[in-house]
Amino acid sequence: ANHFLPGEGFRQDPEELVRISQSLLEGLLASICPEGVDSPESGESSGPQIGGIGISAQMHGILYVDQNGKAVSPFYTWKNEWGNESYQAGKTYAQYLSEQTGMDLYAGYGSVTHFYLQKKGLIPQDAAAFVNIGDYLAMVLTNTFEALADVTIAASFGGFDLKKRQFALSAMETAGVDISYYPAVTEGKAVGTYQGVPVFTAVGDNQASFLGAVKDRERSVSVNVGTGSQVSVFSGELYETGKGEVRPFP
């Protein structure tokens, strides 16, 4: 699933990612419930019940969907570096947005990629919104069309107000970003069902790894020496020191 499409931009095929993910899900459900899934709504108890389907997704990246929830672009991953290209007055796209908004925005962040594509005229004409790949998987599984992003994913796009837990749309619009494509922010929402089982909005992979790795989040430190190379701790309050990155927790 790490295969990139030919050419620059570290882009992936969203339909292939969904196909692989759905195949893995089918195999998992079959191994847990060989005689069929008993959903919470079914009222039956002939076998194991599945309380819900959770999704964890790599953060920052975006893809565009049309009004019917169909992908109309590749998935531009967090590795995309177009935001580091020169924009104006000797500044890159990312530097310009950071200066204009007063927020830290980097190449690979969804808001920066979106701004680059907007200025280059590369947003598909039939695009209605952008979402993360995990959001798109949830849409496909539940056959829903509303563009939603869990707060953990939404914040990773950049241009996000941590105190309000919403996009800083006014600041982004003032900086010249077309804000009409931003998804609605939600928290822990079941967007629909798959085989009768609730499917929840995707959670950021960093937060999901912390949630799954520690027993006591209040007294634990998670050290990831893999791809992320991250040290993560939990805080019940918004605690900004300027020495690390604060991310919403589910």
Feature map (PLM): residue ranges:
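N-terminal glycine/serine-rich phosphate-binding loop of ATP-dependent small-molecule kinases
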Residues: 1-73, 99, 126, 173, ...
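Acidic, glycine-rich active-site loops and adjacent beta-strand->loop/helix elements
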Residues: 2, 59, 81-82, 189-191, ...
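Glycine/Thr-rich phosphate-binding loops that ligate phosphate moieties of nucleotide
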Residues: 5, 51-95, 122, 235-250
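Short glycine/serine/threonine-rich phosphate/pyrophosphate-binding segments
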Residues: 57, 111, 208-210
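Short coil/turn connectors at secondary-structure junctions
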Residues: 60, 72-74, 125-128, 178-181, ...
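Short beta-strand-to-turn element immediately C-terminal to the catalytic PLP-Schiff-base lysine
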Residues: 63-66, 117-118, 139-142, 161, ...
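Gly/Ser/Thr-rich active-site cleft segment
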Residues: 97-206
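Catalytic phosphate/nucleotide-handling subdomain of diverse soluble enzymes
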Residues: 204-250
